[in-house]
């Protein structure tokens, strides 16, 4: 399959991305909808989830991506490999996350990852960053106790801001105040491999959803 070419940066606040998506019937998507679910927000070409779904078939995987051609390409590859625990959806996470979380069976979402999100360096563009207080609150409300949120970036400013947003939500507890020395997941992303091959740092943090008082 030829590699799909897309723009690297997509403005999630543009008018074309302000239509709330329709979520599928999850019982029709996954062979076993009772498995724990890993949600990857901003999955790009989906190669990370493709490897995870193969390595950990006891989990279901859902990738959200705002660039629709990448979603179509990733789902085609998943179908070719007959992976019934993997699905990708075209979505603007800042708009669609709450409806998505409401659509899922209660308690199945056990892990969320946000990896190397678009940094949007210019100050006037920072409101386009995916991790906003509203996203954190939505996850805190939906995730069961013990669920994990894994964050990583090669941009210190972006990683620090993401961690600040999650640390400000009392229902999340960071596992370690220092950056994690290694990725706790068994599969690296394509971006992670590229950064490490250049011997550049990757900043990682893990948050756990705390039990209700």
Swiss-Prot record:
Binding, substrate: 122, 154
Pathway: tRNA modification; N(7)-methylguanine-tRNA biosynthesis
Entry's Gene Ontology molecular function annotations: tRNA (guanine(46)-N7)-methyltransferase activity
Keyword S-adenosyl-L-methionine among UniProt keywords: yes
Any Pfam family hit: Methyltransf_4
Binding site for S-adenosyl-L-methionine: 40, 65, 92, 118
Record's GO cellular component terms: tRNA methyltransferase complex
Name the record gives this protein: tRNA (guanine-N(7)-)-methyltransferase
PANTHER family to which the protein is assigned, alphabetical: 3-DEOXY-D-MANNO-OCTULOSONIC-ACID TRANSFERASE/TRNA GUANINE-N 7 - -METHYLTRANSFERASE, TRNA (GUANINE-N(7)-)-METHYLTRANSFERASE
Active site location: 118
EC number(s) per entry: 2.1.1.33
Reactions it catalyzes: guanosine(46) in tRNA + S-adenosyl-L-methionine = N(7)-methylguanosine(46) in tRNA + S-adenosyl-L-homocysteine
Keywords on record: Methyltransferase, S-adenosyl-L-methionine, Transferase, tRNA processing
Gene: trmB
InterPro entries assigned: SAM-dependent_MTases_sf, tRNA_(Gua-N-7)_MeTrfase_Trmb, tRNA_methyltr_TrmB_bact
Family listed: Belongs to the class I-like SAM-binding methyltransferase superfamily. TrmB family.
Task of the protein: Catalyzes the formation of N(7)-methylguanine at position 46 (m7G46) in tRNA.
